[in-house]
């Protein structure tokens, strides 16, 4: 059975409460998430020998998350990754977005979802966070209502589900910007770790990390 505790972790510069949720299962594994940026703060899991370690990177104090350039563990949007030159065309209309990464638009702008307080609530063994992005927010068309659902169970499985509704055709690409170190935070480099992604295709990017729009076959890639 998963138990969920919550407490006020700190305050934003604007005086909003930052809530920290701790989800703990019967095996002693736990996940901590915050309503600031709908962020994963820590994931403490047993390794193959049963030794517990925090396997994601995070900050010990909430102030570390204020406009954190690495967006550690945060939910980013409206659009994760880059939009070239901060310009996009939707249904024949051109929209200009904030340029916040060299000459490009990154992760939805400076005041993207990673740098906001989300509404949050507990539902049985899950935490649900939500926010409303108004029409024109960061230059995007349409009001966007977003939910991030964090599920944790006694098999040590953590699942995030993102849901979005909009009243206009728009661009939405939500993700969580978590950094893993399966040997434990602070244990050293992850360059010798092996990762398997159950994906059949990969989105091609150019040398500026801008998506080209081409979907490439993932078969045979490293």
What are the roles of these predicted feature ranges?
Residues 1-222:
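An exposed, glycine/acidic-rich loop-and-rim segment of catalytic or binding clefts
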